[in-house]
Structures are given as C-alpha cells and as structure tokens.
Amino acid sequence: MAPFASLASGILLLLSLIASSKACSCAPTHPQTAFCNSDLVIRAKFMGSPEIIETTLYQRYEIKMTKMLKGFDAVGNATGFRFAYTPAMESLCGYVHKSQNRSEEFLIAGRLRNGNLHITACSFLVPWHNLSPAQQKAFVKTYSAGCGVCTVFPCSAIPCKLESDSHCLWTDQILMGSEKGYQSDHFACLPRNPDLCTWQYLGVSMTRSLPLAKAEA
C-alpha cells in the first residue's frame, strides 16, 4: 500500500500547487433546490476530526445520523451512514467542518456515490437549529412536493425572465442582498395546478402565496 500512499500524496501536493490560487466558488441555492437536487438529506452529528484516505483525494468525517429526510429508495436496506466523504483540499471544494460541538445536529444534503455519502463546500449543510421553523417543516415534508415539478428560478439582476409557468422567481438576492431572505426562509415553490407553480407560504397558522411574477415578453 505504501506506493499508492506515496502516489496519492504526490498528487495531492501537485494539485495543491496548481489550484492554490483558485478558490472554490458556489452559487447561491434555495433550500428547496438543495433538497430536490440531492440524493440524500439527513440530520446528523459530526463525531470528530476528518480522516485522510491516503489512496484517494478524499477525506471522511465520522457522523452519527439521527434522521433520514430523503433517500430511502436510494439506500435500500442501509440503516444509516457512518461517514461523510469530501475532497481533501479546499481548492477542490472540500468541506471543512469547524464546529467542535459533537452534540450539535446538522442538516446535510449530499450525493450518493458507491453507497457513500459525499459532500462538498457547496453542499447545503447547516446547523439544524439555524433553519427557520418553516424550513425545518419543509425539509421534513413539504419541499418534496415540488421536486421534479417546480423550479426555483434565481433572479440575480433586473430584469428577470421566467421561462416557464412551472418556475418561481427567487428574488431574495435582489431585494434582500442575500440568498437568506424571506423566500428562502418562509416559502416553497409548489404546484398550484398541473401547469402552474407558485410560491406558497410555509407558516403553521396560515397559508398564502406571493404574487405571481410575470415573465417578460
């Protein structure tokens, strides 16, 4: 195994030199988009520091899954995941877990590869308690209703154009200056009828929709 370890170390060093000036860039993502585009969505706790896998360009974090929110069909009879895999270097969008609190629970939206959970710096991965009550509710049972049917369409500059009635115009970046705005925190893009999707409020005590955004001619 030593030759493979030496080769992997050499490759890591070479890539770090090549990519040292390149930072990982991630596009803003609405939580619903993160849910729908992920193979797996779980709640889990990180149990320690990452372990470098010498024969690959990856490292892995030991995790303790507390609840699976998406991915039941994909994992089959698997009862959980012990590790989350990520690129070993930040320049390759490797995820770096900074919290030292092993009792803190995180929402992890990742990909399934060869039966393993994979995450990157661009993955939707946040402390569960940092999510709004509406987001927590949506990750458990609401976002799934829009997957494959509706699309959150980012608006990063005015004017914005909708390409389909199944799109919901996401304007948080324009109106709030951040992707963590009102639509992200409190709304989901859901079907109103077979040919139309609209923003729908995720509050517990009331249900209302944002005004429909009209596409430019």
Curated annotation (Swiss-Prot):
The modification Phosphoserine is found at residue 178. Glycans are attached at residues 77, 101. The keyword Transcription does not apply. Residues 24-147 form the NTR domain. GO terms for cellular component: basement membrane; extracellular matrix; extracellular space. Induction: By follicle-stimulating hormone (FSH). Metalloproteinase inhibitor that functions by forming one to one complexes with target metalloproteinases, such as collagenases, and irreversibly inactivates them by binding to their catalytic zinc cofactor. Acts on MMP1, MMP2, MMP3, MMP7, MMP8, MMP9, MMP10, MMP11, MMP12, MMP13 and MMP16. Does not act on MMP14. Also functions as a growth factor that regulates cell differentiation, migration and cell death and activates cellular signaling cascades via CD63 and ITGB1. Plays a role in integrin signaling. This is Metalloproteinase inhibitor 1. It comes from Rattus norvegicus (Rat).
